[in-house]
Amino acid sequence: MSDLSLQLQQASSQLPVSAYFDEALYARELQTLFAEGPRYVGHRLAVPEAGNFHTLPQEQHGRALVHTPKGVELISNVCRHRQALILQGRGELDTGTGGNVVCPLHRWTYAAADPRPTGMLIGAPHFEQDPCLNLHNYPLTEWNGLLFEKNAAGRGRDVAADLASLGPRADLDFSGYALDRVELHECNYNWKTFIEVYLEDYHVGPFHPGLGSFVTCDDLRWEFNRHFSVQTVGVANRLGRAGSPVYQRWQEQLLKYRDGKPPKYGAIWLTYYPHVMVEWYPHVLTVSTLHPIGPQKTLNMVEFFYPEEIVAFEREFVEAQQAAYMETCVEDDEIAERMDAGRRALMARGEDESGPYQSPMEDGMQQFHEWYRKEMSV
């Protein structure tokens, strides 16, 4: 088979340009891929101690993780009386109210600190009869501390089974880590475009001066499974030369913390389809998830975790790493916006084009397209 025919064969799994703008297809994606897929809600480190709560920013704070005596639970954060939001952000339930959930508007009180079902209405001032309106409680499943909502209809993914064969699970261990920050990043392009950029290393050298001098794709290793892929890349030049001032600061902080010794990898990037990404960097773990808002708007939520001692004592390390991460994120935005702008231009003139995959640097993108076509039956 000639190189040209191989390229043409490879390109057959690419998606048509209309797939990034079509409202009907987008609605079907939400139902088929997201509603019945791995429904990530947050990490248990957001509520490490009993009495902690964390409202979900990706859901306009409409639900909350609460650490009760029964464990970490997910409840509605909307009062059953006048539908007001109850809890705000991250914090601790007020011990003055017995550690229960209390709406500040009219003092409706819901159980969260005793054997009664969490979210059960236990107080409604000035009502002669109990309204019997409880907060909804949503069952959870857990993998490596990542919390996923169980699908009430009995469908959806078995996360533990999907990720059972994951090679670098030990590197993605959150033991001894703490959540430092949650970043919400709005992307003006299709969610699939985000995943495509994430799953190809072809652009790292040309488009990421900072990241491209921090990691090297010369020793890129892929791990593929039915519902996930993993990229592992090495350290560039023993971190001897930074490609941007922001990465210079990050590399200096990293080498200072490590007494000048380079790490074993540059990065590990896990993608659990369709939208969960767990990332390893030296002394850093992140969970990045996509929450589609429309065919051309996507919310990216990034949670930054570090060893507890770094969170407590190494603020310069934390700030330098997050600045480097966000520099790369902004560069990825430009790539994705250019791609979708080109697709829109092709669609406007009634044309459809796609190019070949570069192997091995775009193998992940090809697997994602094949996974998408199978799941969506297209």
Question: For each of these PLM feature ranges, what is it?
Answer:
Residues 12, 38, 180-182:
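Short, solvent-exposed beta-strand edge segments and adjacent coil->beta transition regions
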Residues 19-59:
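Non-catalytic accessory segments flanking enzyme active sites
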Residues 34-38, 84, 203:
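Generic structural signal for secondary-structure transition and capping sites
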Residues 41-47, 129-130, 265-269, 303:
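Short linear motifs in intrinsically disordered
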Residues 46-153, 161-164:
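Rieske [2Fe-2S] iron-sulfur-binding domain
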Residues 66, 76-77, 139-141, 146-378:
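C-terminal catalytic domain of Rieske-type non-heme iron oxygenases
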